[in-house]
Amino acid sequence: MTCRTRFAPSPTGYLHIGGARTALYCWLEARHRGGQFVLRIEDTDRERSTQAAIDAILEAMDWLGLGYDEGPIYQTQRIARYQEVAEQLLAQGKAYYAYETREELDAMREAAMAKQEKPRFNGAAREQNLPYRDDPNRVIRFKNPIGGTVVFEDLIKGCIEIANSELDDMVIFRPDGFPTYNFAVVVDDWDMGITEVIRGDDHINNTPRQINIYEALGAPVPRFAHMPMILDEQGAKLSKRTGAADVMQYKDAGYLPHALINYLARLGWSHGDQELFTRQELLDLFDVKDVNSKAARLDMAKLGWVNQHYLKTDDPASIAPQLEYQLAKLGVDIAAGPAAADVVVALRERVQTLKEMAEKAVVWYQPLETYDEAAVMKHLKLGAEVPLGKARELLAAVDAWSVENVSAALHDAAAALELGMGKIAQPLRVAITGTQVSPDISQTVYLAGREGALKRIDAALIKIGAA
C-alpha cells in the first residue's frame, strides 16, 4: 500500500514552530517511503478561520520547501460530502438526531460533576429514533459503542487502550450545519486514502473516537503516530515569547529555511550522534517510528549554531537573495553598495543569522556618518595620515577592483613605509567603517568600492587634520 500522509492545519493563526515540525515529519515520512503528501486546510471554524492565516500557512510551507502532492484541500468545500456520510450513518442506525437545549446539557454536566463523574452526554435520545425537525438545537450524534475497548498501536507511543465507557455519543454535526472536527477528519482521511496520521499528542484522546467512526463506516483505519510537544528552554509549554512564533518570524530573524528544517528534524528525532543533515540524508534516514516519545526542548543557541554552519558552508550566491531581503527590511538601497554574495563571504564567519549580517553590512551601503570616538582617538591621531595617505595613493592606482588587488595594494603600502600591516589596517578600518572591528581589511576596503573607499579615506584625513 502506498504511504499517504497529510498535514491538516486550522487557519486560525500563523504556522507556528510545532506545526512546522508536524508538517516536516509528515512530509519526510511520505517522501522516505515513496508515498504522497497531502495538504488539507481544516477551515470549518468559520468564526476563527481567516484567509490571511491560510495565506500565511501556504507562504511558510513554500519557504520551508515542503511541497505537497495534493492540495490545498479545503474542508469548507466538502460540506456536502460530510452531510452524505452523516446521513449514511443515520440510515444505518449508527447516528441519531438529538435536540437538547444548552440548559439541558449544562444540567447533565452539573449532575455528573456532583457525583464526581466525568461530565458527559447521557445518551437520552440514543434509542428514541427522533425524526429530523427544524430546531435551533438540532445536532447529529454518533452512537459510540457502549462496551469494549479501543486498542491501537501508536507508532511513537506504543500500545494505547481506552475503554468505550470513557467515551460518550459525540456530536458529529452542529446546529449550524457544519461537521465537528472528529467527524470531518475521519471522512477526509478515508476519502483521501491517508495511511499514516502523524500529529501532536494533544490529539491522542480524539483517536479512539475517530477509530470508532472508521469502523462504523467500514473504512480502513490508518496508523497513528502522536508526537510529543515542544517545550521551551525552561521545560514549560511554548509561548510566543519563548519560541512559538510564526515560522516566517524565523525568516525575519535571519534563519535559513534549510537550517530550520535541519533543526526541527532533530527536535525529537535522531540518527546516532549526527547533528547536521542534508535534505537528502533526512529523506533517506527518517522513520517516524524513531521519533522520541518524550517532549523535546527548544534550544535557540543550537538553532543559531546550525544556522551559522550553513551560512559558512552554503554557496554565497544562494544566500545572497536572503541577505538582500534583510537589507531591504532595514531600508537599504541594495544598488548603492556591493554585491550581496561578496558581503556573505566577508561576514559569514562572524554572525549566526542573516539579520546580524545585514546589520553589520549597512556600513557599505550608506554614507559613513558616525565614528566610534574611542576608535578615532586610538587610530586616527596625528601620524595616521602617513599610512592612510599611502594606502589611498596605491588604492587609487588599482586597475581592476578586486579583493586580491586591494590586498596587494595595501601590502605594497605597508612595504613602502616599512610598517607592519596592522599599522595600515587599523586606521584604514576606522576610516572605512567608523569602528575598529570589521572583517579582513582587504575585504572591508573592497566592499566599500573604489570611489567609496577613497571618499572615506579623505574624510578620515580631514578628521585627522592632515588633508
From Swiss-Prot:
Q: Name one GO molecular function term.
A: ATP binding
Task: Show the Pfam families listed in the entry.
Answer: Anticodon_2 (PF19269), tRNA-synt_1c (PF00749)
For this protein, the Enzyme Commission number is 6.1.1.17
Q: Where's the motif 'KMSKS' region? A: 237-241
Q: Note whether Protein biosynthesis occurs among the keywords.
A: yes
Domain of life, per UniProt, equals Bacteria
Where in or outside the cell is it found?
Answer: Cytoplasm
> Which PROSITE patterns does this chain map to?
AA_TRNA_LIGASE_I (PS00178)
Q: Which GO BP annotation is one of this protein's?
A: glutamyl-tRNA aminoacylation
Q: Motif ('HIGH' region) spans which residues?
A: 9-19
Reactions catalysed, as given in the entry = tRNA(Glu) + L-glutamate + ATP = L-glutamyl-tRNA(Glu) + AMP + diphosphate
**Residues noted as binding ATP in the record, renumbered to the chain:** K240
Q: Which residues form the signal peptide?
A: none
What is a single cellular component term in the Gene Ontology annotation?
Answer: cytosol
Name the protein family: Belongs to the class-I aminoacyl-tRNA synthetase family. Glutamate--tRNA ligase type 1 subfamily.
Cite the record's note on assembly.
Answer: Monomer.
Q: Could you tell me which HAMAP family the record lists for this protein?
A: Glu_tRNA_synth_type1 (MF_00022)
Per the entry, what this protein does is: Catalyzes the attachment of glutamate to tRNA(Glu) in a two-step reaction: glutamate is first activated by ATP to form Glu-AMP and then transferred to the acceptor end of tRNA(Glu).
Q: What is this protein called?
A: Glutamate--tRNA ligase
Print the organism lineage: Bacteria, Pseudomonadati, Pseudomonadota, Gammaproteobacteria, Lysobacterales
Q: Which gene encodes it?
A: gltX
